[in-house]
Amino acid sequence: MGSKPWLHPAPQYKTLETFWDDEDDAPGPRCAHTLTAVAATKTHGPRLILFGGATAIEGGSSSVPGIRLAGVTNTVHSYDILTRKWTRLKPAGEPPSPRAAHAAAAVGTMVVFQGGIGPAGHSTDDLYVLDMTNDKFKWHRVVVQGDGPGPRYGHVMDLVSQRYLVTVTGNDGKRALSDAWALDTAQKPYVWQRLNPDGDRPSARMYASGSARSDGMFLLCGGRDTLGAPLGDAYGLLMHRNGQWEWTLAPGVAPSPRYQHAAVFVGARLHVSGGVLRGGRVIDAEASVAVLDTAAGVWLDRNGQVTSARGSKGQIDQDPSFELMRRCRHGAASVGIRIYVHGGLRGDVLLDDFLVAENSTFQSDISSPLLASDRTQQSSTPRFSYAARPPSGSEPSFSMSEGLSLDENSLEKLTEASAAEAEVASSVWRAAQLGAGTLDEEPSTSDASSPIVESTTDGTANEGDVRLHPRAVVVAKETVGSLGGMVRQLSLDQFQNESRRMVPMNNSDVPQPTKKFTRQKSPQGLHKKVIAALLRPRNWKPPGNRKFFLDSYEVGELCYAAEQIFMHEQTVLQLKAPIKVFGDLHGQFGDLMRLFDEYGFPSTAGDITYIDYLFLGDYVDRGQHSLETITLLLALKIEYPENVHLIRGNHEAADINALFGFRLECIERMGENDGIWAWTRFNQLFNYLPLAALIENKIICMHGGIGRSISTVEQIEKIERPITMDAGSLVLMDLLWSDPTENDSIEGLRPNARGPGLVTFGPDRVTEFCKRNKLQLIIRAHECVMDGFERFAQGQLITLFSATNYCGTANNAGAILVVGRGLVIVPKLIHPLPPPILSPENSPEHSGDDAWMQELNIQRPPTPTRGRPQPDFDRSSLAYI
């Protein structure tokens, strides 16, 4: 322990007092039930759902106690995390039969149940869903085609990659099983697929534990083999990008073999509790609590790292919680950094207590010395990588893109857009060039031919080299505020899917706004009103009637106050580390709140006193809360002018945001007259936004890229603001619209699929630009990337995208980059929220958000994933420049 202070021991459990109105609301003594965490909704905080189990046992001191099937139940109880109150639920619809030793998993605001055993024998393998949408509790029986896992009990199931229901092992009444099945919840009709995983397969077993880590690894732990012996091994099941699943044996030594135990993940730490040994003897006290730290690849107990299995005469100091946790067949779930345990069996005594442990040192999993580059190899062994490093010769597995991939239907929708996007991008470009009389302009020869200067130390406070942290920080795919502590670390080796990009789109020209406005003195505290109303990372909720809370006069005054600040800022900002960098938000205000909630927010109650914020543009369009997004960012700029920084994106232009949702949103939410007034005023403000930022003179941040025309930072600095796209500036067009080529093997300049006149630039251009300007890194936004961030040019350029599930179809993650004082850059990610599947009430036709996005996608669809073959009709436009 002394040499590895970042390895924190297993937590201590204690009894938690709970409340209920009637005795019927309390779950009472029971075992072999399930306890499942359900994320918070708009109207309710996080909950635990307790279902089924046995309320009576048979046998005595002379025999191994077993559940009495006549005492098995199908009652449902809900525990409110915030009020600590139990309530019995009586959902509508046909409930599943009474059962115990079944399996359960949360899917959004629903809980799925499968299998088990009851008074009538084995339960069927039907899937039952408890739907809690809008707090209207209802049972659904899910129709699944074809053969399934079959009736079984003592098995495990969880939702993997927020998409696949995976169930493994168990007992079919004749023997213990070793098979594995998966059901893709994103594809209808629903079909169980029997998996044929590669790798070291676990032996047949029952009464194991299984839990899915937030990045997509399903961990199987312990169990009882065919001879009745307890097992102490652990296996990870993961899916490669080609669809092939693989079992991998986990390293480390468990404190004890066990079965009929429970295990749940909190971040990267699997918390294991209770269990029994051969013959049904409850596990020894000192081994009753354990943690498998998957970030370090070691097992821990209350005293630290475990190097060998504990004997029954362990020398560990006794702790009251040891005896408390001696139990089996209990239920367990985690919410945030807390682990909850209910009931179970100890000897011949049914338990009804409710326990909690807090993984208070959990955040050290993210900031611990383990993350340092000289220790990255300690996290895995050659046979098993907790960072999901793939076997040699295969593609990396269960990366952020797993469960974030595009289905065929989504790809078809994206493909429809290439011609439309090319048309609008081309029209903007050609209109600007014709107006300036500079069509087919080439870069200045003086700039292009200036000598390349080798990078040298510039004497700034941060003299260390810029480097990307070896691990990214990823938060679970859950609703804001519900599982807010569910964070894990992901090795960057895993992000080899970084050439997959989606291209945002455009379509047709629109006149530049001409309406001018008179200015009045800005009301005192207007920006504070905005911050108070919107900066609510934990509990912000979309307005029910969609009416925006500011009127046009207030919008004008807010824009004026922010404009005065932007007018006095440089075109290229000079910034210092530490700083957080955000990519495209596109009106997805909920994602901004999630990022603030999980990784800190700009307030004196947050982290603004010691870290700055930089936003790279594209604040509006596409999402349905562009007004909230831009007004909050402007208010934060007014409140913290030296700490919050905004630069311009290509959607901060009237020609573009008239087409992709912002103008429509302003009219819809503010009325036609006030809406057009506000939309025009915002676009006047956008013309004053800075265009790039330098961090410590070593990192340049921009929205698009360097294109064909930008060779020096001075070219950007010379752009005079305010400026509109019809000014015909080739530098501005490249800065806001250009993209890197598809991958590092494609050098030089090539036409951009966005439209004629736009280009992509190769890694050679990036290297040349960095050398010439003594820079080490370019951070840019502009393109949707599946993992939220993507490296290019051997890591000299990073693309950053912060909005998740772009256009409602991309299913991408969102990310920010945290640039530390030592210029070490840590990517921090969020997944898209789980889709509301399996529920008629939550189908797309019932979702306002989906309807907004779908209608816009039909009119202005995004283009296909980067790297897909270009359609035959468009290949002629891809001549080399």
From Swiss-Prot:
Uppermost EC category: hydrolase
Subcellular location, record wording: Nucleus
Kelch repeats: 60-109, 269-320, 338-385
Active site residues per record: 651 (proton donor)
Main location: nucleus
Keywords, sorted A to Z: Hydrolase, Kelch repeat, Manganese, Metal-binding, Nucleus, Phosphoprotein, Protein phosphatase, Repeat
Metal-binding found in the keyword field: yes
Pfam families, alphabetized: Kelch_KLHDC2_KLHL20_DRC7, Metallophos
The keyword Repeat is annotated on this UniProt entry: yes
GO function terms (MF aspect): metal ion binding; protein serine/threonine phosphatase activity
Cofactor: binding details: Binds 2 manganese ions per subunit.
Family to which the UniProt record says this protein belongs: Belongs to the PPP phosphatase family. BSU subfamily.
PANTHER family: SERINE/THREONINE-PROTEIN PHOSPHATASE BSL3, SERINE_THREONINE-PROTEIN PHOSPHATASE BSL1
Protein name: Serine/threonine-protein phosphatase BSL1
Source organism (scientific name): Arabidopsis thaliana (Mouse-ear cress)
Encoding gene per record: BSL1
